[in-house]
């Protein structure tokens, strides 16, 4: 399976986040921008299963997950499948493993505009619109 960056009008976005309320907020933001959402999931094993079962276009990944897990095994799989990703962390870029120094990072707390900016940068060919089909204003 590979990232399907050109397939279909609604991109599919994987969410990795262990904070329940934040996961729901991210999911709501992405759906409001016209995305289909996979997850959210809070553990590495669950995320790896989701990646294999559901083709994704992009992933938003909390670095530190439940049970002191880090998301790096998931990142390695996404890279192998050529699926772009964004790290979400409260620790800034300093909290990212040096192997992923070139990755896109947004710091918590983040804004809707930051999420939208990541979507536009990583998937510029997708139509960023609301659930009602009306293009979003920037």
Ranges and model annotations:
Residues 88-89:
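Hydrophobic/aromatic residues positioned on beta-strands within the core alpha/beta folds
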Residues 20-39:
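Two-component/phosphorelay signaling modules centered on CheY-like receiver
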Residues 99-106:
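As written
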Residues 40-58, 63:
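Acidic, metal-coordinating helix/loop segments flanking the phosphotransfer/catalytic sites
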Residues 52-54, 77-83, 94:
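Conserved phosphotransfer cores of two-component systems
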Residues 1-14, 45, 104, 111-138:
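Non-catalytic signal-transmission and effector/linker regions of two-component phosphorelay proteins
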Residues 61-79:
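Conserved phosphotransfer microenvironments
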Residues 17:
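Conserved acidic carboxylate
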């Amino acid at each position: 399976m590979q990232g399907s960056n050109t397939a279909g009008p609604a991109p599919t976005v994987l969410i990795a986040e262990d904070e329940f309320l934040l996961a729901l907020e991210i999911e709501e933001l992405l759906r409001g921008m016209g995305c289909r959402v996979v997850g959210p999931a809070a553990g590495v094993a669950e995320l790896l299963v989701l990646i294999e079962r559901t083709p994704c276009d992009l992933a938003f990944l909390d670095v530190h997950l439940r049970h002191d897990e880090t998301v790096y095994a998931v990142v390695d799989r996404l890279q192998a499948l050529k699926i772009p990703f964004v790290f979400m962390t409260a620790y800034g870029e300093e909290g990212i493993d040096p192997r992923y120094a070139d990755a896109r990072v947004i710091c918590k707390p983040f804004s809707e505009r930051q999420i939208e900016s990541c979507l536009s940068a990583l998937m510029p060919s997708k139509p960023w619109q609301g659930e009602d089909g009306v293009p979003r204003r920037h």
